[in-house]
């Protein structure tokens, strides 16, 4: 019997992602919907690396990923107490994730495997805030482009996370 495939940030170490994912799974259980959280990892290939190069010069990507990551690492290095608290927090996130998210797919490595495995789902659903942000909308995972036409695509509480999208990003 086919089931629903859920694309969610269940293992991201922030409260919003984990609580949204958990609330979604609780609601699916309440409605007796058979589901599993889809686990997908990009296969690093020369083509993927080549496609990623323009993103390194994208101001949104630079701000969202590079600058924020650098600032966080610098703060943790300069303030050892913050690093200790962060380690405790990350441990709590890991335990929450391990205890709450049991219905997981096998890990699908690479886009081709993700597309192939999507055939086992009646529907795929994306659920969490800001998964369609300009820096991530083109991933073809959270926008559900991997699923074929016969698979129902559902968005639950998904947003762009910005109030305006640049013209060059508006064609999705």
Language-model features, listed with the residues they occupy:
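Aromatic- and Gly/Pro-rich donor/ligand-binding loops
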Residues: 4-15, 19-167
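Conserved small/polar residues in nucleotide/adenosyl-binding loops
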Residues: 171
């Amino acid at each position: 019997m086919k089931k629903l495939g859920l694309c969610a940030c269940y293992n991201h170490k922030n409260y919003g992602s984990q609580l949204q994912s958990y609330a979604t799974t609780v609601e699916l259980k309440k409605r007796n919907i058979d589901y599993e959280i889809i686990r997908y990892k990009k296969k690093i290939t020369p083509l993927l690396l080549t496609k990623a190069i323009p993103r390194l010069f994208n101001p949104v990507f630079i701000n969202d990923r590079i600058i924020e990551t650098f600032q966080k690492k610098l703060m943790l290095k300069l303030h050892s107490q913050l690093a200790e608290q962060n380690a405790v927090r990350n441990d709590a996130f890991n335990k929450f994730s391990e205890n709450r998210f049991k219905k997981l797919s096998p890990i699908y490595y690479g886009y081709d495997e993700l597309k192939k495995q999507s055939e086992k789902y009646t529907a795929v659903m994306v659920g969490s805030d800001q998964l369609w942000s300009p820096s991530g909308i083109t991933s073809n995972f959270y926008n559900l482009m991997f699923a074929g036409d016969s698979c129902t695509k559902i968005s639950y509480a998904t947003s762009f996370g910005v109030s305006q999208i640049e013209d060059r990003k508006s064609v999705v």
